[in-house]
């Protein structure tokens, strides 16, 4: 499971001209699911993202977590994170999980975040979405559950 996280001053997601999710300060999380992912991967990423110290403290140092600053998450499913561009000119998305597998894991990820007391807004799974945000920093990180300790 891959997550691209962006620190944002505000963000929203629109489907068919209607805003379906919006946050003030917090994180935009673009989440991709692959075939081997499990709920343990969703739990790992939720834990990591909730506690990652990427918000500035009073000294301007990245020393505070999403939980500590009371930030929200705008969570957007994005199968294209598993696009393979090594051959040809068109990405291959065979590594992305099919919707019937990806949707429950995407929902589990959001549930794990909510279980930590984080306000989570979402896009619409599988829809064409317009995501708008004001990057804060900018701070953009990529986290892959396959890189967690114990995975060799």
From Swiss-Prot:
Gene3D superfamilies: D-tyrosyl-tRNA(Tyr) deacylase
Reaction equation(s) it catalyzes: glycyl-tRNA(Ala) + H2O = tRNA(Ala) + glycine + H(+); a D-aminoacyl-tRNA + H2O = a tRNA + a D-alpha-amino acid + H(+)
Chain segments annotated as transmembrane: none
UniProt subcellular location: Cytoplasm
Chain positions of motif Gly-cisPro motif, important for rejection of L-amino acids: 137-138
Pfam families given in the database record: Tyr_Deacylase
Key words of the record: Cytoplasm, Hydrolase, RNA-binding, tRNA-binding
InterPro entries (UniProt xref): Daa-tRNA_deacyls_DTD, DTD-like_sf
E.C. no: 3.1.1.96
GO cellular component terms listed in the entry, alphabetical order: cytoplasm
GO biological process: D-amino acid catabolic process
Domain of life per record: Bacteria
Family: Belongs to the DTD family.
Xref: HAMAP family: Deacylase_Dtd
NCBIfam families from the UniProt entry: D-aminoacyl-tRNA deacylase
Protein name: D-aminoacyl-tRNA deacylase
Organism of this sequence: Geobacillus thermodenitrificans (strain NG80-2)
Source lineage: Bacteria, Bacillati, Bacillota, Bacilli, Bacillales
């Amino acid at each position: 499971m891959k997550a691209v996280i962006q620190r944002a001053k505000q963000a929203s997601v629109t489907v068919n001209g209607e805003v379906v999710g919006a946050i003030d300060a917090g994180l935009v999380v673009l989440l991709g699911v692959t075939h081997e992912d499990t709920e343990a991967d969703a739990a790992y990423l939720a834990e990591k993202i909730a506690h990652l110290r990427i918000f500035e403290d009073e000294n301007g140092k990245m020393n505070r977590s999403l939980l500590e600053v009371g930030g929200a998450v705008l969570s957007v499913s994005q199968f294209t994170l598993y696009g393979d561009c090594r051959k040809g000119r068109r990405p291959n998305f065979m590594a992305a999980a099919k919707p019937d597998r990806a949707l429950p894991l995407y929902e589990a990820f959001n549930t794990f975040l909510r279980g930590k007391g984080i306000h989570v807004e979402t896009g619409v799974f599988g829809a064409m979405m317009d995501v708008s945000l004001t990057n804060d920093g900018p701070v953009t990180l990529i986290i892959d559950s396959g890189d967690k300790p114990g995975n060799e």
